[in-house]
Design a protein with these regions (language model features):
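N-terminal interaction/assembly modules
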Residues: 1-163
């Protein structure tokens, strides 16, 4: 079962943050990044709510941080995006490089590079409709970087899809 669209957007947002962490920490294993991310997100949510772990009921304490934050479908989709993208980094980069006109892939900003990888994985491997993925990628690039990043990502992914 697929989570609703707004939840899929949140899953992509979380996945991008973890993929950026992997890009910045290339020796970190995906499972460590996932565990750390979920724990950090849970801690931030608890702090914002003014709660301590002692305030949790017994059932909540039995859950892992990721289980407390998101439904099973959202969490599974997020983790599928992260694991899949990280497992295919070299192949995704090789597929994207020809479409980064006038840019060396290594010289792209970390956000732009990771957004492109995530989108390419979702288009090619998960077969999500390209217009949906491109729109999401543009929004993520604009949110985590700037308007120009959104335009750049749009151009690269448009060429990538037309291939």
């Amino acid at each position: 079962m697929k989570p609703p669209t707004n939840r899929r957007h949140k899953a992509r947002e979380w996945a991008l943050q973890m993929i950026v962490q992997a890009d910045l920490n290339p020796f970190a294993k995906p499972e460590m990044i996932l565990a750390h991310f979920w724990e950090q997100q849970w801690s931030c949510r608890q702090e914002a709510a003014g709660k301590e772990d002692d305030d949790l009921d017994e059932m909540e304490r039995a859950l892992q941080p990721g289980e407390r934050l998101a439904s099973t479908g959202v969490r599974e989709f997020t983790e599928q995006l992260v694991r899949g993208t990280l497992a295919q980094l070299d192949a995704l980069d090789a597929q994207l490089v020809p479409f980064c006109e006038h840019w060396s892939f290594d010289r792209l900003g970390v956000i732009e590079r990771c957004v492109l990888r995530l989108a390419a994985y979702e288009i090619r491997t998960l077969k999500t409709p390209a217009p949906v993925v491109i729109n999401e990628a543009i929004e993520l690039a604009k949110y985590f970087s700037n308007e120009e990043a959104g335009a750049f990502v749009n151009g690269v992914l448009d060429r990538f899809v037309r291939g």
